[in-house]
Amino acid sequence: GFANCNALSLSTEPLESSLPFDRRRDGFVMGEGAGVLVLENWETAVTRKATIYAEMIGYGNTCDAYHVTFPQPDAVSSSRAVEQAMEEGDAFKIPPEQVYMNAHGTGTPVNDAIETLAVKRVFGRNAHKLYISSTKSMTGHMLGAAGAIEAIACLMALQEKILPPTINLQEQDEACDLFCVPNQAIAADITLAISNSLGFGGHNASLAFRRI
C-alpha cells in the first residue's frame, strides 16, 4: 500500500534512509514499536503518589480531508491543531525558547515542508526560536505506535532536559528552515513539549505537555 503510494524511501543505505527535513529525503522508513501512557486526573495521581512525568495541558484535533495521502498545502488545518493545543493550555505565554516540538517529520518530500509551514503559521516570527526534531529519523515510522512513543519522547525531554536530535540532517532543505536539532542531542531547559501527528487523510493531532 505505502509503496504504491510512493510514500516509502527507495534508499539502499539502511542507516541513512530516514531523512526528515533534509533535501535528500524521498519517503519514510517503516519501523516497529509500542508505547503505553497512563492519563490520569491530577488529584487521584497525587493522592496515590503516582510518578507524574508531565501535565497534559491541551490537545488539538482537526481533519481537513484534503486528499487521501497529500496534506493540505496551506497547512491551515494542521496548524489549527497545534493552535488548539496551545490555546487550551494557555501556552502561548510560554517563551518560544522554552518550547520543544516533536514533529511528525516523516521524511517525505511534501510532509516536512508543509509541517514547517504549519509551525510558522502558529508561531510567526518566533518559529525559529523553537526546538524541533523528528525522532522518526531514528525509529522510523511506527504507524499506530508513533504518536504514543513520540509523546513519551516529549515527556523524557521535559524530565531530562535533553532534546532528541534529527539524525542524518546533513543538507537541510530551505523549505524546512527551522532549528531541527541536527544530528546530536542537546541540553535545553524547556517548559513545554508538543507532539504532532499528521496522518494520511488529513487527520491532525497535537498534544501539549508542561513540565511540573
What are these regions (language model features)?
Residues G1, E97-N111:
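Conserved beta-ketoacyl condensing-enzyme motif
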Residues E13-F92, V99-Y100:
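Condensing-enzyme catalytic core mediating Claisen C-C bond formation in acyl metabolism
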Residues T51-Y59, P95-A103, L130-K136, P164-Q172:
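Beta-strand segments within the central parallel beta-sheet cores of soluble alpha/beta enzyme folds
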